[in-house]
């Protein structure tokens, strides 16, 4: 049976907040000024302001959660592709980033 209501409250650790805020900043830099990505820019700006609050619990809207989850999934897939094509040193450097994003996806954003 499908749940009627989902909880969009998250308790991130300090490292997870840093990772998410750097991810949002990078995404905003890439999408800045393009009118096609107006909704994504608005959602990521809102997420970034919520991540910078000192409060422990962060409450996302459904739109923010779905956009963030989708972008993180795409990022994990892209990192995995780059790791498969690369040599040992690059693979070794990217492995920690891959594990951080995949753990974040598994722990907080698994449907």
Describe these PLM feature segments.
Residues 1-111:
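Positively charged, low-complexity terminal tracts
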């Amino acid at each position: 049976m499908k749940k009627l209501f989902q909880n969009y409250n998250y308790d991130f650790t300090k490292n997870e907040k840093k990772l998410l805020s750097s991810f949002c900043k990078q995404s905003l830099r890439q999408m800045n000024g393009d009118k096609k990505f107006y909704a994504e820019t608005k959602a990521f700006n809102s997420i970034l302001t919520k991540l910078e609050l000192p409060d422990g619990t962060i409450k996302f809207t459904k739109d923010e959660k779905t956009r963030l989850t989708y972008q993180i999934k795409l990022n994990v897939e892209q990192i995995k592709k780059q790791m498969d094509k690369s040599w040992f040193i690059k693979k070794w450097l990217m492995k920690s980033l891959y594990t951080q994003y995949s753990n974040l996806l598994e722990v907080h954003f698994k449907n």
